[in-house]
A protein has these predicted regions:
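Membrane-embedded alpha-helical bundles that constitute the cytochrome b-like, heme-associated redox core
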Residues: 1-332
Length: 332
């Protein structure tokens, strides 16, 4: 009995109707394979890639994706302690002044919480070290990925190297973070470092000290705190949105007006629903940031900023601190 015909089907036998199920894919930049730094896309992609060969053995070496995993984990978990600090600071510098409508009354609540977040050891543990780790891990992670892109895809000309380097690939979330670094540094300089240099500590620094600074230079401090609070709140809210999977401030752009000729037939049936969901998330996240920044500024500028000048020896001490501030002391 002749054996059955086991040859492959001819071209004419192929069900041409299956071609309808093919999807039209838009071209995307090669750098998107690595995901965004802020939302840790690359962690999941690297972990989903199976190991070469038949055996799956634990890798203890510091390979590329392991570097990404560790750096992304540091960048993510280093945001937890500062979030607790900023929540407490938000209550002390905005909510409580808004409720008491008085700087001296709000100062009493600040004194109650001072041992929790202003002691040298605890403050560095929940604020200084995590923020430094967060910024450093982000810088190292971007350099690792930019060098990998240059190695994999080539960067021979100056324009090619520029397109694969550190700065052009930054998302809005990352740009807000790097804008926040000098703003936060100035805040630490005026409220921590200078009092430590002049008085040996910041025990005399409180809401009255900040209100005294507003009287000395109202234009500078109003503009500074307006930018500082807006950038800080947007970065924190946008960062937590990214951790939760709500990508609002990433570099990827949805293609709304660039629909292909076969869209709606080749796998794009849910595109409109996805875009509506993205717009809804955008409004929610940015709405939370607007409300948070507005409340914080209402307490900081509306109550503390109008608290008035200090009196007696305390005002003289504060004047000496502001006069000793380096670089920006002439504006204060």
């Amino acid at each position: 009995m002749p054996p059955q015909d086991l040859s492959l089907p001819k071209v004419d036998d192929v069900d041409t109707r299956s071609l309808i199920s093919m999807q039209e894919l838009d071209p995307s930049p090669v750098s998107e394979e690595f995901g965004d730094i802020e939302n840790s896309d690359f962690i999941h992609k690297a972990q989903d890639v199976p190991a070469h060969g038949g055996l799956s053995l634990p890798k203890l070496g510091l390979r590329g994706h392991n570097w990404d995993s560790w750096l992304c984990a540091i960048q993510r978990f280093s945001t937890y302690p500062p979030t607790l600090f900023f929540t407490l600071h938000f209550a002390n510098t905005s909510l409580i002044p808004l409720m008491t409508r008085s700087v001296p009354a709000a100062e009493n609540y600040l004194l109650l919480t001072r041992p929790l977040y202003q002691s040298p050891s605890l403050e560095h543990a929940i604020l200084t070290v995590p923020i430094l780790a967060h910024v450093a891990s982000g810088i190292v992670l971007r350099n690792v990925r930019s060098s990998r892109r240059a190695r994999l895809y080539g960067a021979e000309t100056r324009s090619q190297r520029y397109s694969l380097t550190f700065w052009p690939r930054m998302t809005l979330q990352a740009r807000l973070g790097y804008m926040l670094v000098p703003l936060l540094g100035a805040h630490v300089l005026v409220n921590r470092i200078v009092p430590l240099m002049v008085d040996g500590g910041s025990s005399g620094v409180g809401l009255g000290y900040v209100a005294h600074g507003f009287v000395r230079s109202p234009v500078f401090w109003n503009i500074y705190y307006l930018i500082f609070v807006a950038v800080g709140v947007w970065h924190i809210v946008g960062g937590w949105a990214n951790w939760m999977g709500w990508r609002v401030t990433t570099a990827r752009k949805e293609r709304i007006n660039k629909k292909g000729s076969l869209e709606g037939y080749l796998g794009y049936t849910d595109s409109e629903h996805r875009m509506r969901k993205q717009r809804k998330i955008w409004w929610i996240v940015n709405g939370i940031a607007v409300v948070g920044a507005s409340i914080w500024l209402a307490g900081a500028l509306g109550i503390i900023g109008l608290g008035g000048r200090g009196s007696g020896w305390e005002a003289s001490s504060w004047d000496g601190m502001y006069d000793r501030v380096p670089i920006i002391g002439a504006w204060l």
